[in-house]
Amino acid sequence: MEFNPQKQLAGLLEWMDQQMTQCGGKTAVIGISGGKDSSTVAALAVAAYGRENVYGVLLPNGVQPDIDYSQALVEHLQIPHCTINIHDAVQGVLQEMEKAGLTPSRQTAVNLPSRVRMATLYAVAQTLPAGIVINTSNLSEDWVGYCTIYGDSAGAFSPLGMYTTEEVIALGRVLGLPEKFLVKAPSDGLTGLTDEDNLGFTYHAVNEYVRRGVCDPAIREQIDRKHRTSRFKFQTLPVYHNGLQIGRASCRERV
């Protein structure tokens, strides 16, 4: 089935409105990187809630060469926003680990900024009127687990969680976003490598596999392995069901 972004919009915006209502929220809080995902989510939020109810947060880690994209995006959408540099917070944690006799691994250094960003977004959300953090991940990233648990995978709900990277771009175009925000190559912000460099295959390959089942066998094996080993990132926190009662409901009904 051919993807029609215009037909998708009405249902998606209605769903976003329902999710915000269920959360008891008013202000959509979004981390702004200036790439296709955060730009498209921000544009969707403006369409769903009105720009006065969308708050963008720019979260550079020290000197960020592409921060101009983030600034240009919030100016284009004319949404309230702020900039909070997470460098000192990230370095503070790493330094305290060193003092405790712990040597941070490379993976720690890669994932910590994402978790600090999410903690900051929630701090901002709790400071604003009924602030709700909206997730900006897409299906392609999530399918291969290219996200940080309790970092960029977090949020109250995920508007793009069932859209591939190419479908996100199509949605962004229908929403009138300038092309520069949609074609900006995503990177981890630390190594200088793009997501696709780190993955070892393209998002297009993931998209073709997810939507059409078409994939080179060698790449399919890589995708399947990453998908299989990353499912824990998206599961509700497992709880041991001990059979004891909670009021009139069993513990099994807790989650």
Locate the predicted segments by residue:
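ATP/NTP-dependent adenylation/nucleotidyl-transfer catalytic domains that generate, transfer
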Residues: 1-28, 52-55, 62, 71-86, ...
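Conserved G/P- and acidic residue-centered "switch" motifs that form tight phosphate/ATP-binding loops
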Residues: 35
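Short, surface-exposed alpha-helical segments at coil->helix boundaries
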Residues: 38-42, 67-71
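Conserved SAM-binding loop of SAM-dependent methyltransferases across substrates and taxa
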Residues: 41-49
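Glycine/proline-rich, positively charged
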Residues: 91-92
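Catalytic-core regions of hydrolytic enzymes
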Residues: 115, 119
